Regions:
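N-terminal glycine-rich FAD/FM-binding segment characteristic of electron-transfer flavoproteins
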Residues: 1-339
Length: 339
């Protein structure tokens, strides 16, 4: 009762990285609240799944194993969470802001009339004062996310209804194993008690999984371009520099919206979150929405003609100049010195 729950997204028999990241965060939240961390795994052929999950500090793993639970379809997974939560009454539920999470989260929160905050960039525990009614709420989940196009950061709380639900994008939270030998309880549930046969009305006939075009999230060096790159041709220069540095190329939302780069390269609150050892920002002003996706980089270098650009305030090094001037010089230098 009143524990922290994480819904585990599973591809085949492998737990998704975003779910493991949320287990890490969930463990920290549970420690602050003095409660347990529980996880829910629903799929097929899940024997031994606990080996992937318990090391993240999970006190109880709820397993639902049945042929109709993979590939994912909406109704069975919704019934599992709704009926389980009616029994267990969690205070917090976290899930990935993925295609599945964006489908499942609203269904569950609507069924439980609990509300949900999508695409959170931070999750914290705190106090909320309702000055109008003179009520103070302790130990609420602060669901923090950029709002109004990334121009402000909003802190959202849910004082009355439970569970407090939030989705988080992959890469926003850090994935850290707590203890390889962590001892947690594994509960294998009778799926039929939670899911009516009518929920299996949708059958997945075939699946086509598109391979990733790049490894932006895992790259040690990321070169990102903004609207200041001016054109697709400007981005070609970044790809040329990336080739010399064995880096990946990312983009700000403004650059993607302008058609300079593909959407799958977008870094920020509505794109990918990256934590490279080196991040080179070229022609990026540094709106809150973008900074949320790269602020944990080891070293940040900003190439910008505006000395007052917001991104310069978090950069370790600032090169004050136009990208048309600076980027070709970087390419020339590394071509000369990498041989």
């Amino acid at each position: 009762m009143n524990n922290v729950f994480v819904y585990l997204e599973i591809e085949g028999t492998t737990v998704a990285d975003v779910s493991l990241e949320l287990l890490t965060k969930g463990r920290k939240l549970a420690n602050q609240l003095g409660c347990q961390l529980e996880a829910v795994a629903a799929g097929n052929n899940l024997a031994g799944i606990e080996k992937q999950v318990l090391p993240y500090g999970v006190d109880k793993l709820h397993v639902f194993d049945a042929p109709g639970l993979f590939p994912y379809t909406s109704l069975p997974h919704t019934s599992i969470l709704v009926n389980l939560f009616k029994e267990e009454k969690p205070q917090i539920c976290l899930m990935g802001a993925t295609v599945i999470g964006r489908d499942l989260g609203p269904r569950v929160s609507s069924a439980l009339t609990s509300g949900l905050t999508a695409d959170c960039t931070q999750l914290e525990i705190g106090t909320h004062e309702d000055k109008k009614n003179g009520i103070t709420y302790e130990n609420l989940l602060y669901q923090i996310r950029p709002a109004f196009g990334g121009n402000i950061v909003a802190t959202i709380v849910n004082p009355e209804h439970r569970p407090q639900m939030a989705t988080v994008r992959e890469g926003v939270m850090k994935k850290e194993i707590l203890d390889e030998n962590y001892k947690g309880e594994v509960v294998n549930h009778d799926v039929a008690k939670f899911v009516p046969e009518t929920d299996y009305v949708v059958k997945v006939i075939d699946r086509h999984v598109e391979k990733a075009k790049h490894n932006l999230k895992g790259a040690p060096i990321v070169i990102a371009g903004g609207y200041g790159m001016g054109s697709k041709e400007g981005f070609d220069k970044l790809f040329e520099l990336a080739k010399e540095l064995h880096a990946e190329v990312g983009a700000s939302r403004a650059a993607v919206d302008a058609g300079y780069a593909d959407h799958d390269r977008q870094i920020g609150q509505t794109g990918v979150t990256v934590r490279p050892k080196l991040y080179i920002a070229c022609g990026i002003s540094g709106q809150i929405q973008h900074i949320a996706g790269m602020q944990d980089a080891g070293i940040i270098i900003s190439v910008n003609s505006d000395p007052n650009a917001p991104i310069n305030t978090i950069a370790d090094y600032v090169i004050n100049g136009t990208v048309e001037e600076v980027v070709p010089k970087l390419i020339k230098y590394y071509k000369k010195n990498s041989k």
